[in-house]
Amino acid sequence: AVASGKGGVGKSTIALNLAAALSKAGHKTGLLDLDIYGPSLPITMGIVENPEVNDQQKIIPVIKDNLKLMSFGFISGNQAPVVWRGPLVAKMTEQFFRDVVWGELDYLILDLPPGTGDVQLTLSQKIPLDGAIIVTTPNDIALTDVRKGADMFSKVKTPLLGVVENMSFMQISGKLQSSNTDLSDVELYINEKKISLEDDKSFNYKFHLFKEGGGLNESQRLNVPLLGQIPYSEDLMLSIDKGEPLVFSNDKHPVSEIFNKIAQSLEEKHE
């Protein structure tokens, strides 16, 4: 399960690309979007069709790029807001396991809603999870909610597999150029920090949008690995808008390689 203590940290993007990485590695993989109040899978995978129902009134997952996909957004049309009480949310959560024909899978990645609500409670009572990954950004508010999520998984005896830090930094690359000025003695500073310049005056700089090291410190506190640090990436954002995971559209991209390493770490845990 891929979880987060709060919304807006990129949990669904992480879950989608992790599932894509496992699929590309040759595993039979499913992705279940359990965020009933705000399903995103129809948009992030560019899917408009509804899932089919077989003769036994069981739902057939939508298949795209060898991924078996299911989301409440496929059923609701992803249009009207969902205003449901806890028991109805719990019932729908169970149906995604009982009434969906997943078939044989190596991995079923669950994209949980943020927080510690009805879906998480239902899973802990009804569905045995092999483990949970918590997604966070490196700022204090998100990290505080990580602790709440970790405590919840601990109480329901679900192993915590690790932490993924999203939006860790922004990679800034450039080159100083001038047609009429000698740049041999020029120095570059960003936020009062001197930036190293190559001989050709090019540079690479990691700009931390939030504080540095938040995810690492939290993973150490929880005694679990920091599985990956995902930089802020325009390519990653655009891939979501296009409805195609970056891991599928450009598996050589530096961010895709991070997702591949996270998938590899999961494979090693479940050999």
Task: Identify the meaning behind each predicted range.
Residues A1-D33:
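Walker A/P-loop phosphate-binding motif and the immediately C-terminal alpha-helix
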Residues G7, D33, L41, M70, ...:
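Residue-level signature of catalytic and energy-coupling elements of molecular machines
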Residues V9-N17, P39-P42, L112-Q120, A142-D145:
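Short glycine/serine/threonine-rich phosphate/pyrophosphate-binding segments
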Residues K28-W84, A90, F97, L216:
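Phosphate-binding loop that captures ATP/GTP phosphates
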Residues G73-L123:
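Phosphate-binding/switch loop-helix module in NTP-utilizing enzymes
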Residues D106-Y107, P113-V224, Q229, L238:
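Conserved catalytic-core segment of NTP-binding enzymes
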Residues K242-V255:
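C-terminal boundary of histidine-terminating zinc-finger modules
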Residues A263-E271:
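Short, hydrophobic alpha-helical segments
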